[in-house]
Swiss-Prot record:
Residue stretches spanning the membrane: none
PANTHER family in the cross-refs: PERIPLASMIC PHOSPHATE BINDING COMPONENT OF PHOSPHATE ABC TRANSPORTER (PTHR30570), PHOSPHATE-BINDING PROTEIN PSTS (PTHR30570:SF1)
Protein name: Phosphate-binding protein PstS
Renumbered residue ranges of the record's region Disordered: 23-46
Disulfide pairings: none
Gene designation per UniProt: pstS
Cellular component terms per the entry's GO annotation: plasma membrane
Pfam family, any one: PBP_like_2
Biological function: Part of the ABC transporter complex PstSACB involved in phosphate import.
């Protein structure tokens, strides 16, 4: 299993409407002069961060529109591979099979770590016995092996567990499957809407669910967080500090994947991506998540600028060759 360390809201509808798709109408790139659009799709976990970023962006870029849906990480990558989007929001790293499909289509991309998150396990606020769980106990619950709380711990009530999970289109599902389930199938009530998962746990006294830290923070008056106990007996809970330094057992990075072609050919996309990295995680914190270390943003911004500079120099050489002909 892969452990991530030191990598660098409002309730949303079916899509975070920030603008239209994928074109560049020109402009100098300075504030109001920048015109065009860029389109994304992907993680509902990342969506609140993109919404906060766009609130800041739109103040100075009224004619440069950014749109991003929240159909889930997997669904986002499907559209990214199909050529329907300029960028893809993800709450997990891109899979090998997704990389292969992009490679087969000749699509190159940049991966940007824009924030950090901790997948939070929560039970109903009236649950007075579940304070911590091991990954093994979580696996028993979500594989269906443990059907009652007594099956998890003999001192707990003999009451049926109501386990809920995101569906397989979500990166949070993939992350949990890898980090907790050891690739075993998740046998629980599944829902595409994270807010519906939160609601299910709040309404059912025997409920348990998992979701991004932001969703717990927004609903902590109605939920009870469960700490994670590792094999050595160390207990950790999700806090901004433990998520950022990677000591929380279910911490993870959050990503935006941007197509090289869009970065090179669409000024709106390249300027927005620079804006995201220059923000240094402030929007992530505003959305209830955790910023990556500043050096993470700086190194990625430097790499992006180098990439764009090389592209611009290459374009000038091509233009010169055309003139010489």
């Amino acid at each position: 299993m892969k452990k991530w360390q030191l990598v660098g809201t409002t309730v949303l509808g079916a899509s975070v409407l920030l603008g239209a798709c994928g074109g560049n109408d020109g402009g100098s790139g300075d504030g109001k002069d920048l015109k065009g659009s860029a389109k994304g799709e992907g993680s509902s976990t990342v969506a609140p961060i993109v919404e906060k970023l766009n609130e800041k962006w739109a103040k100075d870029h009224k004619d440069a529109k950014i749109s991003s849906g929240q159909a889930g990480t997997g669904a986002g990558f499907q559209k990214f591979i199909a050529g329907e989007t300029d960028f893809s929001d993800a709450s997990r790293p891109i899979k090998d099979e997704e990389k292969k499909k992009l490679e087969d289509k000749g699509i190159k991309y940049h991966e940007f770590k824009i924030a950090q998150d901790g997948v939070t396990i929560a039970v109903n606020k009236d649950n007075d016995f579940v304070k911590e769980l091991t990954k093994s106990q979580l696996k028993d619950i979500y594989s269906g092996k443990a059907k009652t709380w007594k099956d998890v711990n003999s001192s707990w009530p003999d009451k049926k567990i109501n386990a809920v999970s995101p569906n397989s289109s979500h990166g949070t599902y993939d992350f949990f499957e890898e980090e907790v389930m050891d690739k075993q199938d998740i046998k629980a009530e599944k829902n595409a809407d994270t807010n519906a998962i939160v609601s299910s746990v709040t309404k059912n006294k025997e409920g348990i669910g998992y979701f991004g830290y932001n969703f717990y923070e927004q609903n902590k008056d109605k939920l009870k967080e469960v700490k994670i106990k590792d094999d050595n007996g160390k207990v950790t809970e999700p806090t901004k500090k433990t998520i950022q330094n990677g000591s929380y057992a279910l911490s993870r990075p959050l990503f935006i994947y941007a197509k090289d072609k869009s970065l090179k050919d669409n000024k709106v996309m390249s300027e927005f991506m620079k804006f995201v990295l220059e923000d240094e995680g402030k929007a992530a914190e505003d959305a209830g998540y955790v910023a990556s270390p500043k050096k993470t943003y700086k190194s990625q911004l430097d790499d992006l600028k180098d990439f764009l500079d090389k592209h611009q120099k290459s374009d000038k050489k091509d233009d010169k060759k055309s003139e010489d002909k």
